[in-house]
């Protein structure tokens, strides 16, 4: 069949061309999936999408992930004898994160999906560790620290298996919790396995270092802030080279640090790199980025700056000269809008308090 050769050709090109970005790969996988769909070939459509959602992990926006994952779920439900549910259970964890990141998704919808995820783990004989970890992360974000501690204990006591989150991600979440409850020194101690390079994954320790650096700046711990910036910058090199836009909020924290540390030009360089990523992101990534950049801009006395910014930026001008005060107002306004949406969804005031 000619169409299967077209699909195989695209898959070969994806595997053979090492210069392709995740976004390039997603686009080509979608082409292959469209060919399969046009020929009513569910099996090829399924196989291609399993690969496609793997690449979605490096995208800042979760729209593609949610769309293609929904297709996989429907294919499995309609043909349970054709496919293995374990093919996509790991990626289900990413989907949960994207639902929390989108303020348009109600908490009721999230709860229903969480229970579905839990039931699928149980019926496939897996530990509930990733389920508890998700609830731990959610409650930390919402400032429900007693609940967070409850789920942290459940997570840590749950058996580990092939569906469990990697040790570096588990540690990263725990460090976020320690920072949020004011245990900065303990967070700096717990991070040592990452510093010693005993564990790591695609975004950790870069993300972790940026979080500790950000809190160090807020606490006036300048020595620790500089030390963890240095760690973060080294860990970010490959991420920036790979144009991994899903890390935009972490780069935003680096911008904030540099503006406060008197390294303004370097901060603008990172700003120019990360702003296009911001426009590809959504939800919580955008919120974290806008807050960090706004906080950084508050530290500057500069009035105008020459920048090469994307043409889709609301303040873009051909002269490439920008008033810093306009940038401050823009990012504060964006942060306030996102905070309002999240707090309305979450029935809380946690996000807007970040801007006080």
Range-by-range predicted roles:
Residues 1-30, 43-45:
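N-terminal leader/linker segments that initiate helical-solenoid repeat arrays
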Residues 6, 25, 45, 65, ...:
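Residues that mark the junctions of alpha-helical repeat units in TPR/alpha-solenoid scaffolds
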Residues 9-19, 49-61, 89-103, 129-144, ...:
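Tandem amphipathic alpha-helical repeat scaffolds
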Residues 18-31, 60-74, 102-116, 139-154, ...:
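Helix-turn-helix repeat elements of alpha-solenoid scaffolds
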Residues 19, 33-41, 73-82, 116-126, ...:
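Solenoid-like repeat scaffolds
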Residues 31-61, 81-82:
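Short, charge-rich amphipathic alpha-helical segments embedded
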Residues 223-313:
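Active-site/pore-lining binding-face segments in mid-to-C-terminal subdomains
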Residues 276-356:
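C-terminal non-catalytic interaction modules
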């Amino acid at each position: 069949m000619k169409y299967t050769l077209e699909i195989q050709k695209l898959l070969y090109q994806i595997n053979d061309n090492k210069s392709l970005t995740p976004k390039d790969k997603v686009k080509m996988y979608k082409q292959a999936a469209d060919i399969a769909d046009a020929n009513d070939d569910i099996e090829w459509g399924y196989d291609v999408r399993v690969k496609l959602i793997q690449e979605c992990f490096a995208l800042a926006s979760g729209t593609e992930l949610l769309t293609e994952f929904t297709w996989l779920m429907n294919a499995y439900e309609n043909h349970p004898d054709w496919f293995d549910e374990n093919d996509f259970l790991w990626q289900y964890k990413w989907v949960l994160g994207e639902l929390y990141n989108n303020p348009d998704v109600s908490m009721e919808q999230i709860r229903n999906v969480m229970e579905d995820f839990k039931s699928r783990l149980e019926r496939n004989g897996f530990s509930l560790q990733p389920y508890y970890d998700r609830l731990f992360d959610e409650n930390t974000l919402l400032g429900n620290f007693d609940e967070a501690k409850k789920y942290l204990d459940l997570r840590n006591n749950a058996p580990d298996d092939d569906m469990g989150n990697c040790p570096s991600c588990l540690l990263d979440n725990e460090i976020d919790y320690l920072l949020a409850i004011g245990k900065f020194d303990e967070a700096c101690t717990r991070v040592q396995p990452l510093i010693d390079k005993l564990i790591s994954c695609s975004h950790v320790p870069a993300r972790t270092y940026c979080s500790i650096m950000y809190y160090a700046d807020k606490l006036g711990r300048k020595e620790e802030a500089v030390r963890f910036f240095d760690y973060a910058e080294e860990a970010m090199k490959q991420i920036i080279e790979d144009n991994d836009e899903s890390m935009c909020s972490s780069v935003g924290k680096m911008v904030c640090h540099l503006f406060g540390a008197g390294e303004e030009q370097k901060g603008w360089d990172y700003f120019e790199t990360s702003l296009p990523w911001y426009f590809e992101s959504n939800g919580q990534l955008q919120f974290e980025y806008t807050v960090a950049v706004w906080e950084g801009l508050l530290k500057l006395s500069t009035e105008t700056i020459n920048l090469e910014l994307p043409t889709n930026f609301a303040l873009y001008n051909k002269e490439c000269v920008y008033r810093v005060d306009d940038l401050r107002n823009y990012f504060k306004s964006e942060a306030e809008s996102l905070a309002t949406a999240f707090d309305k969804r979450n029935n809380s005031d946690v996000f807007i308090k970040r801007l006080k």
